[in-house]
């Protein structure tokens, strides 16, 4: 069935009745190109608007890291030296809130001299590769909006000294924007409103960009995913990699201790017994202020979007149906 024949999208058919033949040809072509399967989640109410039961989650804390640091680091360096670790930089955003009309990673954060956000992140990664004596494959996720500018920026700056053969770009997939009933928003008489498919879609975007074969050929078993925003983070951190391996986990998350109960940061926890994240606006006051016997916050492990995943596990769950995390956008409207 054509999308415009769906009862829930009947206004599209009404629009087509008003369009010119040329407009309809363009609109039909566009509608046939888009994957609308995401709408099934919305129509079936498969979203995370209603959360499960939260509970605190333990983490490897500083005292244990200090006690077992040498062990963790050696395990991590071994994995890196064996070519088993890759990194994915999520850099699809623009620097609009920073006053930039270009990719966020191109922000100059230098004081005495020019120092770009992308540059500092590459330096952080090279701190590790210099110690390990091998390069870590880096995959950079861009967006339709900033892909050309991002790739040109890296070319202009000679990849900040990182080997070009170890850097690959891929574009984040887009999904149709819709309302809470799954009705599609339109940008114009011929264009569907589209939005990025979220942080959770990075691996499927990689796969659909044909990069799974590259991961396989390189023998990568662990992927460190991190966001462009944090210029202080350690990338492919041997201690982080080693701790995850030592505990036999399929994934790991770097966290920072919350400074105060009302700090606006999501926290790592469990939800219905499974590891999860509760955003700060989803936490009750009771959750936010609950403390352990030693005075630490029970929900005190703030997430910084720096994760380590088993590549094998990612493949296993790549086609799994996940609930949609709804993000409201004020600038979306239908032209009908």
Question: Can you say where each PLM-predicted feature lies in the sequence?
Answer:
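N-terminal glycine-rich phosphate-binding loop and ensuing alpha1 helix
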Residues: 2-167, 176, 185-203, 212-213, ...
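Generic alpha-helix signal with a bias toward terminal, lower-confidence helices
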Residues: 43, 106, 110, 118-121, ...
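Fold-independent oxyanion-binding glycine-rich loops
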Residues: 92, 143-144, 172-173, 208-209, ...
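Conserved beta-loop-beta/alpha segment of the NTase-like Rossmann-fold superfamily
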Residues: 159-160, 164-263
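Catalytic core of tubulin tyrosine ligase-like
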Residues: 215, 219-224, 232-236, 241-334
């Amino acid at each position: 069935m054509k999308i415009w024949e769906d009862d829930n999208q009947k206004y599209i058919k009404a629009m087509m009745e008003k369009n010119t033949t040329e407009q309809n040809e363009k609109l039909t072509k566009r509608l046939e190109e888009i994957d609308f399967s995401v709408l099934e989640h919305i129509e079936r109410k498969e979203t995370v608007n209603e959360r499960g039961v939260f509970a605190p989650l333990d983490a490897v804390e500083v005292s244990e890291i200090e006690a077992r640091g040498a062990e963790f680091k050696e395990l991590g360096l071994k994995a890196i030296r064996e070519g088993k670790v890759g990194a994915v930089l999520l850099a699809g955003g623009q620097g609009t809130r920073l006053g930039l009309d270009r990719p966020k990673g191109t922000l100059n954060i230098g004081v005495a001299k020019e120092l770009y956000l992308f540059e500092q992140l590459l330096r952080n990664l090279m701190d590790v590769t210099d110690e390990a004596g091998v390069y870590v494959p880096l995959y950079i996720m861009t967006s339709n909006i900033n892909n050309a500018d991002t790739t040109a920026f890296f070319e202009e700056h000679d990849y900040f000294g990182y080997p070009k053969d170890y850097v690959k770009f891929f574009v984040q997939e887009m999904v149709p924007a819709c309302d809470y009933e799954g009705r599609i928003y339109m940008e114009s008489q011929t264009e569907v409103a589209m939005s990025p498919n979220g942080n959770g879609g990075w691996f499927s975007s990689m796969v659909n960009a044909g990069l799974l074969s590259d991961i396989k050929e390189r023998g990568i078993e662990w992927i460190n995913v991190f966001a462009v925003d944090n210029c202080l983070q350690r990338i492919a951190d041997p201690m982080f990699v080693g701790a995850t391996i030592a505990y036999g986990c399929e994934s790991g998350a770097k966290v920072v201790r919350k400074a105060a109960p009302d700090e606006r940061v999501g926290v790592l926890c469990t939800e219905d017994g499974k590891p999860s994240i509760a955003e700060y606006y989803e936490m009750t006051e009771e959750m936010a202020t609950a403390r352990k016997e030693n005075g630490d916050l029970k929900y005190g492990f703030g997430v910084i979007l720096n994760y380590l995943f088993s590549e094998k596990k990612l493949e296993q769950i790549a086609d799994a149906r996940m609930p949609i995390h709804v993000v409201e956008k004020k600038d979306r409207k239908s032209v009908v």
